[in-house]
Amino acid sequence: MPSRSALPGEIKTRKFIRALRRLGFAIDMSGGDGSHFKIIWPKTEKSLTIQSKLRKDVLYYTLKEIEEKFGVTWSQISKEL
């Protein structure tokens, strides 16, 4: 897990979603008003709801959750960005 200072200030949501899709996540953007989306790891069917605006503080905790739940690290995600 990188330090907060090592993370980019803000990542575009579409770019982040594209990287997650390349890693094998399924993305569910249906329902609601569009302020959140759900990523699903097909191997375990576990899911995580993510806020659409990925500020640095939100990104840090999101990456922490992704690593704990799915075992996918920031270095793997950043390679796909």
Where are these regions (language model features)?
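Short alpha-helical interface elements
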Residues: 20, 41-45, 64, 75
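N-terminal first-folded block
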Residues: 1-31
